[in-house]
Every structure is written in structure tokens, then in C-alpha cells.
């Protein structure tokens, strides 16, 4: 007999994913602050300066979080731009989808228009980076 009885088998492990968010959000902070105000000692209320200090601290924290989000978005949006700027002065091989032959040109500038990037070549031709097949040193 080569099988193991089910009474000796270990129970199957189930994977659990914790979605516990340990950061304190605006709503949670305001709930804590309101609870503090509601449960304060009537004979010894919260000092106005302390209350204003707590609100200012929270406001400052919220602004820093918003700045962090904005900077993250800025960096994410700049990533393609910095890549394309690195192509300036380099020769690109590209296709326009109309002809069977590849074309080449040297990138002179990068243009951003309505959410799309375009490479402007020395001859004034504007191409989409999606059409570029290779980037190399300029032969000029």
C-alpha cells in the first residue's frame, strides 16, 4: 500500500490577500477629530490653539500627499518625453505603412501635441515614435 490515509494529510493552505490600508485618510482623521471634540471634558475643553494646530498639521499632510501624487504623475508623463529627447541628433529608421521600403532621417526635435508625441526630422517630416524601427548614431 503506497497511499497515505486522509487522516494523516495536512489541510490545504488557502492564500489570503490582506487589503489593510495602514494610511490614515482625510475621512478617518476628521472622524477622530470629531470624536475627540465630542468626548472632551466640558470643564477642560480643547484649547483653540491646539485644535487649529491639529487642523494645520492635517492640512499640511494632505497637501504633501497631493504633491506626491502630482509629482508621480509628472514623472510618469515625462518618461516617454525624456526617451524621445535622447533620440535628438540620432538617425531613425521608420516606416510610414504606405511604402514597402524603410525611410531614414535624423531627429531634430520632439513635439507633444494633444497627448501624442511626434519626432520632427531634419527635413521637417513628423513621425510617430510607434513607427520607428531603429535608432542609431547619425551618419552625418
Swiss-Prot record:
Domain of life of the native organism: Bacteria
Residue segments, region Disordered: 1-21
UniProt xrefs under Pfam families: FlgD (PF03963)
Keywords: Bacterial flagellum biogenesis
GO biological process: bacterial-type flagellum organization; bacterial-type flagellum-dependent swarming motility
Family listed: Belongs to the FlgD family.
Record's protein name: FlaA locus uncharacterized protein YlxG
